[in-house]
Amino acid sequence: MLSSFAMTELIGVAAVAVVAWFAAGTIRNVYSGRALMRWMQEGMPLVGSRTTVRWLGSTVVEMIIQDPKTPFSSATLVIFLEPRDLPWWPLSRLRGRRDTLIFRGVLRKTPSVELEALDPGSWSGRDALSRIPPAWQIQEGKLRIHHESTPALERAGALIERAREAGMRPARLSVRRAEPHFQIHVALPDRQRPAREFFEAVHVLAELALK
């Protein structure tokens, strides 16, 4: 059996390891979040002139866009990072959690169709399932499309195609009559490409959601 001294030493080492893990994970997330925000500065004016930024812990950055441009009446960006500061980070990855950029917009008109295109293996996709009416139909594919009608399914196909043309990998693409009307959850964009391309694509997708 371990002596009380050895047990104390072991507990001390474990505590230091946990603190070191927390510090390293926090630093990594803060660095990633700030780097992505710097990258977005070039393209942000395409959707709004000013932004209010809040860090919610070390894993979430909320960016509220002030005075958003048409077709948005309000818009929010969320940088959702993996919990690298927590010891169970590997388990969260097994459950499909990945660094994700989320754009949520309230549109100036209510969409005429409702749909959810989801990656069911992702955190975003599983989180959305409980919000989908059971009466909706499902079409399987690389993204599972939940839709209320044939026009909604057609709209989903057009949105997914446009998103992929823009280099996006959506885990969730949502068009709803309730607010927020429009959402897209994507893997963090490639910062080697211009940020304007990302925000131009978001603008086009929101316009397409209203057609």
Where are the predicted features?
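Residues that form generic nucleotide/phosphate-binding pockets
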Residues: 40-43, 159-162, 205
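Structured extramembrane domains adjacent to transmembrane segments
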Residues: 71-197
